[in-house]
Design a protein with these regions (language model features):
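A glycine-rich, Thr/Ser-enriched phosphate-binding loop motif common to dinucleotide/cofactor-binding enzymes
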Residues: 1-4, 91-105, 224-228
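Active-site nucleophile and cofactor-binding loops and adjacent substrate-binding regions
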Residues: 17-26, 93-97, 121-126, 204, ...
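Catalytic phosphate/nucleotide-handling subdomain of diverse soluble enzymes
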Residues: 35, 231-287
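Substrate-binding/catalytic subdomain of NAD(P)-dependent oxidoreductase enzymes
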Residues: 121-124, 149, 209-213, 220-238, ...
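Helix-rich "cap/lid" substructures immediately adjacent to catalytic or cofactor-binding pockets
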Residues: 1-16
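Active-site/ligand-binding loops adjacent to catalytic centers
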Residues: 69-86, 138-223, 264-287
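Active-site-proximal loop->helix
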Residues: 18, 26-69, 73-80, 163-168, ...
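Glycine-rich phosphate/pyrophosphate-binding loop at beta-loop-alpha junctions
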Residues: 28-31, 36, 60, 94-196, ...
């Protein structure tokens, strides 16, 4: 999605891009803007962006502006700035973003050789669920698949405007990537849910962390907390899904983007300050 938005901005002669971000968008915008020789301005909620994501934006040379407010306030600001100044907005309100992101649905279809029965996906600004549905519909209308998936969107309980059908003024969740109270793509997401006979559900932070741990311990997959919302949601709603259904859960971010969460939320054994000798290490290993 971002490579499409940046490429079109470059094509149109843009010299700078801007976005509001909970972390992932800023990292992506900064990377592609740098590759395209453009400046990248990113507005983030001060103190509410995972360090791994902030590090990416900084390394790519983004001009980071941390505000006293949440993502939704940052988005309001960048939307207004992009209307009055020579910067291109690359949040998912930019239609080119969704045109790029929809190709993820193409990849799923090509891998499975059909659409899944269910697609489970985290929702923050709701660009992904909107774009995936766009992609599935395009393949269906082109008669490349025989069915469409039910779109299942999951939000953190403390940040679930689509689930509760209201703006959340002060969203809060451990899953920082989806800590958004007023998603810009809400109408598109609701349309995806309704057209597909899907549903939206909320999952608690505890449910997210439990799924996060399961992915690491049982599947060897290290994702960021927001990604685990799709697994948490599936586990929470599995009784409503028929046996033998083909289900795809989308994981939207690598765990290294939020290392603090990993350090604080794991069941691993970590013994430190050990003496450097065979006897101590053998004992620590339980032999």
């Amino acid at each position: 999605g971002m490579t499409m938005a940046i490429s079109k901005a470059k094509e149109e002669g843009c010299e700078a891009v801007i976005c509001a971000s909970t972390g992932n968008t800023s990292a992506s915008a900064a990377a592609y803007a740098r590759r395209g020789g453009m400046r990248a301005f990113v507005l983030i909620p001060d103190g509410y962006v995972a360090q791994g994501k902030l590090a990416q934006a900084l390394v790519y040379g983004a001009e980071v502006l941390a505000i006293k407010g949440n993502f939704d306030k940052a988005l309001d600001i960048v939307k207004e700035l992009s209307e009055d100044h020579p910067v291109t907005l690359v949040n998912s309100v930019n239609p080119y973003r969704l045109q790029g992101q929809k190709t993820a649905a193409f990849e799923i279809i090509e891998f499975l050789e059909d659409a899944p029965d269910y697609l489970c996906i985290p929702m923050g600004n709701a660009g992904n669920i909107s774009a995936y549905w766009m992609g599935f519909k395009e393949y269906y209308n082109a008669k490349k698949i025989k069915k469409l998936p039910k779109m299942m969107g999951f939000q953190a309980s403390g940040s679930a405007p689509l689930v509760f059908n209201k703006t959340i003024e002060n969203p809060n969740t451990i899953a920082t990537a989806i800590r958004i109270g007023n998603p810009v793509n809400k109408s598109k997401a609701i349309n995806a849910k309704n057209e597909s006979n899907g549903n939206f559900y909320d999952v608690t932070d505890n449910e997210i962390i439990e799924a996060y741990k399961i992915l690491g311990k049982e599947e060897g997959i290290f994702c960021e907390p927001a990604s685990a919302a799709s697994i948490a949601g599936l586990l929470k709603t599995k009784e409503n899904i028929p046996n033998n259904s083909k289900i795809v859960c989308v994981l939207t971010g690598n765990g290294l983007k939020d290392p603090d969460c990993a350090i604080k939320n794991n069941d691993a054994s970590f013994k430190n300050n050990l003496e450097p000798n065979i006897e101590t290490i053998t004992k620590a290993m339980g032999f």
